[in-house]
């Protein structure tokens, strides 16, 4: 759906509208709960601010620039990189467990990403790098958000949505020439409410209870659903590279799930 919206809305403006829509969706749930004492903790606020910058401001814009340059099915598959990056960052910076199977799984996912980018040449590599950088931003966001305990998931999502949405929309209005048509605005807000607001709120709930890497593994089924939607609902042609990449990435994600279950 975001690929369709990009035809009439610029990447910065669309990122802003998606996150503002997400904030609007969860706002009714954001006025109760949480810990006022923890919210005053400087470390908590710093982690949340970094999560807003990486996950709300930078990640969506990088993804949308990549989506504008590549088929939606390919971008959906590249999003599997987020699972790997989240696990690696959780190990490197947040001291979560990383075993040999997870390393092999990471190699399989990266191999799938390379296979997907190669047939498109330079344009494919550029699009793949943009999506990969978005996944790094979201990997940092996932780990930081899992450690923010003074805010409820709805409050965290609302803060991300309002903060990142306002910044990106302001940049879009300056760089991309004003607001898009009302159809584009309403469409982006509706998609944002469901795919960003409720999705992020539910993900944060899981991340705070399960840890960043485990919750990301469950979330990793969504890229494959995105591929099916791109093929069957939006009529994108399926390619051999996409089937091959899906095989590598599916094997990698399955291996990570097995490793996490046994651990």
PLM segments and residue spans:
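Cytoplasmic-side transmembrane-helix entry/capping segments in multi-pass membrane proteins
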Residues: 42-52, 98-109, 128, 151-161, ...
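Specific transmembrane alpha-helical segments of multi-pass solute transporters/efflux pumps
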Residues: 1-2, 27-75, 79, 87, ...
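Hydrophobic/aromatic residues within transmembrane alpha-helices
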Residues: 5, 14, 18, 66, ...
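Transmembrane alpha-helices of multi-pass small-molecule transport proteins
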Residues: 7-58, 85, 137-141, 158-176, ...
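Helix-helix packing/entry segments at the starts of transmembrane helices
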Residues: 15-17, 60, 74-83, 144-165, ...
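Hydrophobic transmembrane alpha-helices of multi-pass small-molecule transport proteins
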Residues: 26, 89, 93, 98-118, ...
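Hydrophobic residues within alpha-helical transmembrane segments
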Residues: 17-21, 50, 54, 81, ...
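Juxtamembrane helix-entry segments on the extracytoplasmic side of multipass membrane proteins
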Residues: 8-16, 40-46, 113, 118-137, ...
